[in-house]
Amino acid sequence: MAGHSKWANIKHKKAAADAKRGKIWTRLIKEITVAAKLGGGDPDSNPRLRLSMDKAMDANMPKDNIQRAIQRGVGGLEGVNYEEIRYEGYGLSGAAIIVDCLTDNRTRTVAEVRHAFSKHGGNMGTEGSVAFMFTHCGQFLFAPGTPEDKLMDAALEAGADDVVTNDDGSIEVTCPPNDFSAVKAALEGAGFKAEVADVVMKPQNEVSFSGDDAAKMQKLLDALENLDDVQEVFTNAVIED
């Protein structure tokens, strides 16, 4: 058993994302464009593109929007050139934060990220200052009540690295990032649909926040998430209910 409010934290993040669907679409279009540019327009041979397309379909994005983003990425349509940048920093009590961005203006982005950190009690670190505290992996989270033994058998057979039951009853499955699509397909084929499935930077240790500190930490994370150039925010902070 591990973790204590994983389910609540994931549900909060998912609800916040659903509430900003228009912004989610914009982020996904950028991600699809970059994925197609870097790895080609065939999702069968481009795992990153497959993942971003799956996310777009889960977000009910029209297929035409997805195809236009792919065409833009492979050079079939005019569009903005985006650059991938990762920023690292700290929140309250030294909580580690990773901010992944896609931007057409590095100067603007770093200024906005730095401002969000400083305004909400955090500070930016140097490259590599917190990334070592995280593991790059595929992550699946299943609702409390999912049959643990059957899920474990299916996950390990599919190529998962680990299956952990959290204190709240949710079950977390992790796998190598390059195997994410195959493991996801195998789990769904076995009848297991994850509530949340993504390739993430998973914290190796967590820092819990409650009361006023939890509210302050959440404001920092929200401020970073709300920046237009930010694609993903990862943290080892656990916000208690």
UniProtKB/Swiss-Prot annotation:
GO MF entries: DNA binding
Pfam families named among the record's database cross-references: TACO1_YebC_N, Transcrip_reg
Keyword Transcription found: yes
Gene3D superfamilies in the record: 1.10.10.200, 3.30.70.980
Record's keyword annotation contains Transcription: yes
Keywords: Cytoplasm, DNA-binding, Transcription, Transcription regulation
GO cellular component: cytosol
GO BP field: regulation of DNA-templated transcription
InterPro entries: Integrase-like_N, TACO1_YebC-like_2nd/3rd_dom, TACO1_YebC_N, Transcrip_reg_TACO1-like, Transcrip_reg_TACO1-like_dom3, YebC-like
Superkingdom per UniProt: Bacteria
NCBIfam families given in the database record: PRK00110.1, PRK12378.1, YebC/PmpR family DNA-binding transcriptional regulator
HAMAP family per the UniProt record, alphabetical: Transcrip_reg_TACO1 (MF_00693)
Family per record: Belongs to the TACO1 family.
Protein name: Probable transcriptional regulatory protein RALTA_A0859
Source organism of the structure: Cupriavidus taiwanensis (strain DSM 17343 / BCRC 17206 / CCUG 44338 / CIP 107171 / LMG 19424 / R1)
Biological classification of the source: Bacteria, Pseudomonadati, Pseudomonadota, Betaproteobacteria, Burkholderiales
